[in-house]
Amino acid sequence: MPILCTTGCSRKAFLKRPKTGDTLCRECFFLAFETEIHNTIEQNKLFRRGDVVAIAASGGKDSTVLAHVLKVLNERYDYGLKLVLLSIDEGITGYRDDSLETVKRNRDDYGMELKILSYDELYGWTMDKIVSKIGRSNNCTFCGVFRRQALDRGARLMEVDCVATGHNADDIAETVLMNILRGDTARLRRCCDIKTGGKDADSIPRVKPLKYAYEKEIVMYAHFKKLVYFSTECVFAPNAYRGHARAFLKDLERIRPSVIMDIIHSGEQLSFKDTVKKPLRGKCNRCGFVSSQQPCKACVLLEGLNRGLPKLGVGKKSKANRMIAAQNSLRQSANLVKTDF
C-alpha cells in the first residue's frame, strides 16, 4: 500500500522531509518550504514595502533557490519589493566564470536586473593572482573579506535598501561551531543574527531569509523544481577551515538529526558577561566601509598584497601592525639615504 502525504491531500507521498520527518507529496513539500520562508520573513520583518532588495547571486543552489522563492513570495503575498541580482566575480578561472553564466541565466529567467562586480576592478587583484602569491593556505581569508566588502560596494552602487544572502541553516550551524572552536566571541555574538547592519544611514542591512532552511531541503527543492544552478565546488575550498566544521556537523547529524536547529537555537540564546570585550563597529578610516577595526581587514590585506607582504593581516592584528611599522621604518630609512646623496 503506497504511503500517502501526511497533510491529508490524498496524494502519494513523494519524499520525507529531513527537517521534520514528514512524508509529503511534491506539491505539499513546495508549499511547506515556501511558507516557512515566508513566515521567517514576516516574523523577523526582513523587508518593507517598496524596498529594493539585492539578492547576492553566485549561481549556486542557495542563491538560485533564494531568487526563485523570493520572486514567488513577492508575487503571492504582494510584498511590493523590487528584486535585483548582485554578483561578485572573484577571478577564479574554471569556477566563477562558469557560475556567472548560470547567474545570467537566472537574470533572464526571472527578469531581474543584474550587476556584476569583480575583485580586479575593485582591488586590482583576482583570487588567481592572490593564490599565486600566498599559496593555497589562507586564501579563503582574502576571498571572504574582499567578498563581504564587495557586496557592500555593489549594494551602494545599486542604491538598494538591503542585501539578501543565501545563508542556510547548515551554514549558520557551521559558523557557530567555527566561532566556538576559535574562541571568537565577537563573531559568535552576531553569526546567528538574521539581520545585520543598517544601524546608520550609510550601512546597508543584510538579511538571511533561508536561515532556518536545511541544505538538504534546498537541494531537493531546486531538483524537483528543475532550477538551473551551478554545483561545482570552488577549486580553493578543500583547504578551508569551514570544511572541518562541516564534516564535524555531518557526523553529529548522523547521531542526532535535529542537531542543526539545536546549534542555531543555542547560538541565539547565548549571552556574554559585560566584561567580555565587544568590538565597536564603525567606518574604516581609509575606505569608509563598515569595520570593527582601523583600518579595516580588507584595507590591511590589500596593503599587504600591494607592498609585497601577502601575509600581512593574516593572523593577529598586532602582528599586522608590527609588519606595517617595520615596512614604514624601512621606507623612511631608504628616503634618508637618498637625501644624504
Curated annotation (Swiss-Prot):
GO MF annotation terms: nucleotidyltransferase activity; tRNA binding
GO cellular component: cytosol; cytosolic tRNA wobble base thiouridylase complex; mitochondrion
Keywords: Cytoplasm, RNA-binding, Transferase, tRNA processing, tRNA-binding
Main location: cytoplasm
Enzyme class: transferase
InterPro entries, sorted: CTU1-like_ATP-bd (IPR056369), CTU1_C (IPR032442), Ncs6/Tuc1/Ctu1 (IPR000541), Rossmann-like_a/b/a_fold (IPR014729), TilS/TtcA_N (IPR011063), tRNA_thiolation_TtcA_Ctu1 (IPR035107)
Location(s), subcellular: Cytoplasm
EC nos: 2.7.7.-
GO process terms (BP): protein urmylation; tRNA thio-modification; tRNA wobble position uridine thiolation; tRNA wobble uridine modification
Pfam families recorded: ATP_bind_3, zn-ribbon_14
Annotated pathway: tRNA modification; 5-methoxycarbonylmethyl-2-thiouridine-tRNA biosynthesis
HAMAP family: CTU1
Function, in words: Plays a central role in 2-thiolation of mcm(5)S(2)U at tRNA wobble positions of tRNA(Lys), tRNA(Glu) and tRNA(Gln). Directly binds tRNAs and probably acts by catalyzing adenylation of tRNAs, an intermediate required for 2-thiolation. It is unclear whether it acts as a sulfurtransferase that transfers sulfur from thiocarboxylated URM1 onto the uridine of tRNAs at wobble position.
UniProt family annotation: Belongs to the TtcA family. CTU1/NCS6/ATPBD3 subfamily.
Protein name: Cytoplasmic tRNA 2-thiolation protein 1
Organism of origin: Aedes aegypti
